[in-house]
Amino acid sequence: MDSAFVLPHPASMGASCILGLLLLTILRALLIPKKALPLAINHHRWDIFNRRAIQDFTANPQDLIKAGLKKVIDPQIAPRFAKGTFLVLPERYSEEVKNDERFSAYEALSRSSPQIILLELPGFESVFEGLMHNDVVLPGVAAMNRQLASLTSPMSEEVSHYLQTNWTDDPDWHTQSVSASMSGLIGQAAARIIVGPELCRNKEYHAITLSYTMSRGRALAAIHAWPRALHPLIHWFLPSCRNVRTQIRRAEKLITPILERTRRHRARGDPPQAFSTLAWSDEYARAQGRSYNATLAQMRFTSSSIHNTSDLLGKVMLRICQRPDLIEPLRREIVAAFDGGSGAQHHSLGKLKLMESVMKETQRLEPAAERVSYPPPLTPERLTGYSIVNMFRVAKETVTLSDGTTIPKGTIFGFSYQNRFDPSMYPDPETFDPYRFMRMRQDPVQASLASFTKARSTHLSFGLGRHACPGRFMANDMIKLALSHILLKYDFKLVGEELPKLEMHGFVYAREPTAQILVRRRQEEVVL
């Protein structure tokens, strides 16, 4: 796979260092034997840098996974993909592995991972564990989940403000970008909770937060075009990496004054302000005596909350456009849920069972992906995330599972997501059935599994166990609020007759980001 990024000619000393390290890397690859794992589905002889393997993986990952799993006869063998050198295991092992401390989710997604997200490089610390701020981010998400009931109304205010400002009150049909609209809407609602009301509508802040993850993805692609041994050096010379660090500095200039005011309020003993992860995390870090970077922490909150959520929201919108017969039943459900005259209340969101079924069925067919660049064409470098393989781990020691399956120390592995097409679990699995999970609620055995936020081995979109996505509850609320406002206030339909093409890049499904819909204002039956 050719890189879309070009390395500018560096200073002579830097060039000499790079050339020397490159030669050492090539010699190491040629002279040091590699310990092969079984069933390297897309391994090619003399493919030193795995370029052919990456091409195979990019072109047909779904078929590679299916082919590999079909070869799993002996339980001690699992398929491996040369792209990144990791195992893909059937879902049946996920329950046993989910909380086993002999496997590390952190190392699988950071230092040891072939999908290296380069947390050790300046500007790249904000995703996943990070280096300085993880001790405040995860408790911050837990605190946010405890505040969900009080956060519904402020999030609803931001959804309403965004739609009125951007979709307007125009009663005539006009065009809106699905991707840009959903990202902007979710970004503003999330910012209200992350940095508070002072900054949540700031255009510069939104531009940074919406582009940071995309810029980071482009920078990662640029770095990974070079051998791993060069990563600690090469990032200093890449414009895309410098851009990431510039964005962090810009975000810091906006966040720091708010943080300083929050600290002054706290020092004076003023009454607590409305919840924000910015204020809560800072107080928590102070109380615990922990050092952290406030800007990187908030960038991580933002990266985690916007892109996956907005991607799924956009897919749900397009599925509803595909099935316009759903619009009126959904509206009736929303009116019934919010017909108390008290605006958006958290308990009302729990009544939206049809909406939740539509959300979960969409997620089953089109697992959420984190888009890192919007401009077309849609290419593998412009997407990140793992949609059809999930729950990555690395073995910290050699582990033998209960059925005799052995996972050697240092092995990186994830779990396939193929059972979402298992007809014994989901009748007619290839068909979009918006009522599927509503019917499941009526089955006493399966009722507890129908919830959108339920993490289970047969639906791995949110992972499983103690590393399951902690932000899924907030995502559930944001998507329901967004859909409620949109369905009540607007008519909408596809531009054209068919859904935009669903494409797969690596492990990720995504619609063409150029998808557009027509919208027009209508009179809502209830006020949120």
Swiss-Prot record:
Which UniProt key words apply to this protein? Alkaloid metabolism, Heme, Iron, Membrane, Metal-binding, Monooxygenase, Oxidoreductase, Transmembrane, Transmembrane helix
What Gene3D superfamilies does the record tag this protein with?
Cytochrome P450
Pfam families reported in the protein's UniProt record: p450
Q: What is its main location?
A: membrane
InterPro entries, sorted: Cyt_P450, Cyt_P450_CS, Cyt_P450_E_grp-IV, Cyt_P450_sf
- Gene Ontology biological-process entries: biosynthetic process; secondary metabolic process
MF-aspect GO terms:
heme binding; iron ion binding; monooxygenase activity; oxidoreductase activity, acting on paired donors, with incorporation or reduction of molecular oxygen
| Stated role | Nonribosomal peptide synthetase; part of the gene cluster that mediates the biosynthesis of the ergot alkaloids lentopeptins A and B. Within the pathway, lenC catalyzes the post-NRPS oxidative modification steps using as substrate the N-acyldiketopiperazine intermediate produced by the NRPS lenA. Lentopeptin A forms via a stereospecific hydroxylation, followed by a spontaneous bicyclic lactam core formation, while lentopeptin B is produced through an initial dehydrogenation, followed by a bicyclic lactam core formation and stereospecific hydration.
Membrane-crossing ranges are 5-27
Top-rank lineage group of the source organism: Eukaryota
- Subcellular localization, as worded in the UniProt entry: Membrane
Could you tell me what this protein is called? Answer: Cytochrome P450 monooxygenase lenC
Q: Which cofactor does it need?
A: heme
Question: Is the keyword Heme in the record?
Answer: yes
- Cite the binding residues for heme: C469
Which family would the database say this protein is a member of?
A: Belongs to the cytochrome P450 family.
Could you tell me which species this protein originates from? Answer: Aspergillus lentulus
Q: What is the lineage of its organism?
A: Eukaryota, Fungi, Dikarya, Ascomycota, Pezizomycotina
